[in-house]
């Protein structure tokens, strides 16, 4: 509940009350990182928050905003053929831009993010992170604005995520998810 409330404050309120916050030049954060041990509900929390935000956006009487949920599992992006993983990253962000052009707010949720956005290595070779991480960064910061597009990453191992991904201005809201208690 604590994580949900924190994300709701940062994400839901700015989207639902844009007219007020636009006067203050507040921008919706670009990204969130949910991390914690396996089985603590990172994916479930992310889906629940985004589903709730999308529902509230569509119910808002004065708002014509709609949200679109793009769910991706990190390992599904991996491909042994040169350039295919990068192409899949481009397709995900193109889909988000297409939704944005239609007046919808896209939410990209990447589960098991450490599998594709791991720390780059200094040595040359077939390390997929050496090409996927720069592509991901280029898509997030590129010429075509991702304004009001929210990216959520979920991982068991935040220490494996490349520092370029989790720096301020990209994925800068980090939330630790703890295992559920008997309560």
Predicted ranges, named:
Residues 1-183:
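Walker A/P-loop NTP-binding motif of AAA+ ATPase domains
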């Amino acid at each position: 509940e604590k994580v949900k409330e924190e994300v709701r404050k940062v994400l839901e309120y700015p989207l639902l009350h844009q007219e007020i916050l636009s006067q203050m030049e507040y921008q919706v954060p670009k990204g969130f990182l949910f991390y914690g041990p396996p089985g603590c509900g990172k994916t479930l929390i992310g889906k629940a928050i985004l589903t709730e935000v999308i529902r509230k956006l569509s119910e808002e009487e004065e708002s014509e905003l709609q949200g679109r949920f793009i769910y991706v599992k990190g390992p599904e992006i991996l491909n042994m053929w040169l350039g295919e993983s990068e192409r899949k990253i481009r397709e995900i962000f193109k889909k988000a831009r297409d939704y944005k052009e239609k007046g919808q707010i896209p939410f990209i949720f990447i589960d098991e993010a450490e599998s594709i956005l791991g720390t780059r290595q200094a040595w040359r070779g077939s390390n997929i992170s050496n090409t996927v991480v720069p592509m991901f960064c280029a898509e997030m910061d590129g010429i075509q604005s991702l304004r009001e597009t929210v990216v959520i990453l979920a991982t068991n191992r935040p220490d494996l995520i490349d520092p370029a991904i989790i720096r301020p201005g990209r994925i800068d809201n980090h939330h630790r998810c703890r295992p559920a208690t008997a309560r």
